[in-house]
């Protein structure tokens, strides 16, 4: 009984802590960005190293802020919603599958959503954190894929 409980807990913690690493290696449909989604959903579990220009906020929602020179961009996750504020001040609302719901300028007027440009900005905001994720000692990629494959395809 204790062995099964211990193995279950280990598996749970492994999948949560290494979810970003696993998400980088899961086959997925273009535009779904599983590594970004897993980073934001599991930020309380994932490795969040000290990186110059990057700060983390986890008081009710999870947010990563990147300051580069005088420009600031923020990716926030709350409930089932991702919200990105670009360095230009535009805001983008996504569902948990990374599908854009709204695109607004700094005056809250609807603007055209330029997928490649916005995803590039989001990637620039969080990529240093994604790059810092450790490789698991015991790789459970097969189990992660089994659980999340349908979500990202």
What are these regions (language model features)?
Residues 4-82:
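N-terminal export/targeting and maturation segments
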Residues 70-153:
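Non-cytosolic head/periplasmic domains of membrane-anchored proteins
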């Amino acid at each position: 009984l204790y062995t099964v409980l211990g193995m279950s807990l280990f598996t749970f913690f492994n999948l949560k802590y290494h979810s970003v690493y696993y998400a980088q290696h899961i086959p997925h449909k273009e535009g779904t960005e599983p590594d970004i989604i897993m980073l934001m959903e599991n930020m309380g579990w994932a490795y969040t190293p000290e990186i110059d220009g990057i700060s983390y906020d986890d008081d009710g929602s999870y947010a990563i802020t990147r300051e580069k020179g005088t420009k600031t961009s923020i990716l926030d996750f709350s409930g089932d919603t991702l919200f990105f504020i670009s360095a230009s001040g535009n805001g983008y609302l996504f569902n948990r599958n990374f599908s854009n719901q709204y695109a607004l300028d700094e005056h809250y007027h609807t603007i055209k959503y330029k997928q490649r440009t916005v995803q590039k900005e989001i990637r620039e905001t969080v990529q240093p954190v994604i790059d810092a994720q450790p490789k698991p000692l015991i790789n459970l990629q097969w189990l992660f894929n089994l659980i999340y494959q349908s979500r990202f395809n």
